[in-house]
């Protein structure tokens, strides 16, 4: 926006759009949809800007580091499935040492279909050497839960992610809902 002489918007306006990627961010910033004639050029500009800044000040949600340590101590494998393309996923996960312990990182373009299709989750299970019914998929978007259910996995809706006020994780049909990463440990202890 500022590159176009427009005032910047507060970061909290963009937060609920993060899960919708460039489409959501550009929609919030400019009121633009993919049908707009300038959308593709602006989307590529957004990608270039994102690529140069995506590792600056990037952190995981509070409690994720401790959760990963606990999973590893329990000898439980974990991975990441994102709709972000490998162009962004690979440098982002490489820049964060925590992700070196992930048994699988599957990007939105790792399979022919992105979430909510189950293919990326099934790919992650395959890379981990696990049957999908031995996996739990945690997500902060309705598409995550749809994909997890279609893959035959246990599903957990996370209320601490990028969802906005309009999202209602209790209505997504997940097997469980958690309010913090550490809540997952309590679920695992009950299993």
Briefly describe each language-model feature range.
Residues 55-56, 77-78, 109-110, 133:
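A generic structural signal for short
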Residues 7, 77, 154:
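Residue-level detector of anion-binding/catalytic polar loops
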């Amino acid at each position: 926006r500022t590159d176009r002489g427009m005032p910047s918007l507060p970061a909290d306006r963009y937060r609920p759009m993060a899960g919708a990627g460039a489409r959501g961010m550009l929609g919030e910033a400019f009121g633009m949809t993919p049908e707009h004639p300038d959308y593709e050029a602006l989307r590529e500009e957004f990608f270039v800007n994102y690529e140069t800044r995506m590792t600056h000040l990037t952190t995981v949600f509070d409690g994720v580091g401790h959760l990963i340590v606990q999973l590893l101590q329990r000898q439980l494998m974990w991975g990441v499935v994102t709709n972000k393309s490998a162009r962004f996923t690979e440098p982002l996960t490489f820049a964060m040492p925590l992700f070196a312990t992930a048994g699988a990182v599957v990007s939105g373009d790792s399979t022919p279909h992105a979430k909510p299709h189950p293919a990326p989750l099934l790919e992650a299970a395959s890379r981990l050497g696990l049957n999908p019914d031995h996996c739990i998929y945690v997500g902060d978007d309705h598409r995550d839960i749809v994909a997890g259910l279609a893959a035959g996995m246990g599903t957990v809706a996370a209320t601490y992610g990028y969802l906005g006020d309009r999202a209602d994780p209790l209505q997504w049909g997940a097997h469980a809902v958690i309010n913090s990463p550490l809540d997952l440990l309590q679920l695992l202890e009950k299993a």
